[in-house]
């Protein structure tokens, strides 16, 4: 029997920041970001749930697409827009419960095999990475590069695609040239000397939003 697909999302998700705190969720929503992911690490359970509840409420207030990384039970419990899972989470997560709750599902992939596995689950979007070397998290795989990204995007026409991994503002035009529908960033915003300016530049490059006149 065919696996039922997860609810759809926009084909082009645009700028997709991945951040680790409620503070960043608040900042980026106020700055006009409409797709983002909360990836909390190393926090106690009570704090995690409190932050996820608050983030979901903020996402709804701004009518944004907020994905919760890893904590799928809390995402289901509190009615999140969506969940993002890594390959290592797919065997332990209750995918049927996520699907039945009406949540969107994004899946990380790091090579052709993982991409094929993701497609069998019919998720809402597929993340392709890591494209460039990254210091944000330890990666067991090597960077895929732009040629591999371009090939995978062309071979994944039925799903929204997200490029992730080591993507700086300077690299964004080259990433977009592959045809990928969304660009995920972490340090390009969170480690920027002026995060508001960096966010505005990324929204301009990826979504065509106008830059405010700089005086």
Swiss-Prot record:
One Pfam family this sequence matches: TMP-TENI
Keywords assigned: Magnesium, Metal-binding, Thiamine biosynthesis, Transferase
Pathway where this protein functions: Cofactor biosynthesis; thiamine diphosphate biosynthesis; thiamine phosphate from 4-amino-2-methyl-5-diphosphomethylpyrimidine and 4-methyl-5-(2-phosphoethyl)-thiazole: step 1/1
UniProt GO BP: thiamine biosynthetic process; thiamine diphosphate biosynthetic process
Family from the record: Belongs to the thiamine-phosphate synthase family.
Membrane spanning residue stretches: none
HAMAP family: TMP_synthase
Catalysed reaction, written as an equation: 2-[(2R,5Z)-2-carboxy-4-methylthiazol-5(2H)-ylidene]ethyl phosphate + 4-amino-2-methyl-5-(diphosphooxymethyl)pyrimidine + 2 H(+) = thiamine phosphate + CO2 + diphosphate; 2-(2-carboxy-4-methylthiazol-5-yl)ethyl phosphate + 4-amino-2-methyl-5-(diphosphooxymethyl)pyrimidine + 2 H(+) = thiamine phosphate + CO2 + diphosphate; 4-methyl-5-(2-phosphooxyethyl)-thiazole + 4-amino-2-methyl-5-(diphosphooxymethyl)pyrimidine + H(+) = thiamine phosphate + diphosphate
Cofactor(s) it depends on: Mg(2+)
E.C. number(s) listed in UniProt: 2.5.1.3
SUPFAM superfamilies: Thiamin phosphate synthase
Protein name: Thiamine-phosphate synthase
Binding-site residues, Mg(2+): 70, 89
Coiled-coil residues: none
Record-linked InterPro entries: Aldolase_TIM, ThiamineP_synth_sf, ThiamineP_synth_TenI, TMP_synthase
């Amino acid at each position: 029997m065919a696996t039922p697909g997860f609810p759809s999302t926009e084909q082009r998700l645009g700028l997709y920041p991945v951040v680790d705190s409620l503070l960043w969720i608040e900042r980026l929503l106020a700055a006009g970001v409409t797709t983002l992911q909360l990836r909390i690490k190393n926090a106690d359970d009570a704090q995690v749930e409190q932050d996820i509840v608050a983030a979901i409420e903020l996402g709804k207030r701004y009518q944004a697409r907020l994905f919760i990384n890893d904590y799928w039970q809390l995402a289901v419990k509190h009615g999140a827009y969506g969940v993002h899972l890594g390959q290592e989470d797919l065997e332990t997560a209750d995918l049927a419960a996520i699907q039945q709750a009406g949540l969107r599902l994004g899946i990380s992939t790091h090579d052709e095999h993982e991409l094929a596995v993701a497609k069998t689950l019919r998720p809402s979007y597929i993340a392709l990475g890591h494209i460039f070397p990254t210091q944000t998290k330890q990666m067991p795989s090597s960077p895929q590069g732009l040629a591999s990204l371009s090939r995978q995007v062309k071979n994944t026409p039925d799903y929204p695609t997200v490029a992730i991994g080591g993507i700086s503002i300077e690299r964004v035009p080259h990433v977009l040239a592959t045809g990928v529908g969304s660009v995920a960033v972490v340090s390009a915003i969170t480690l920027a000397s002026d995060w508001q300016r960096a966010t505005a530049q990324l929204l301009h490059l990826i979504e065509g939003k106008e830059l405010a006149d700089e005086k």
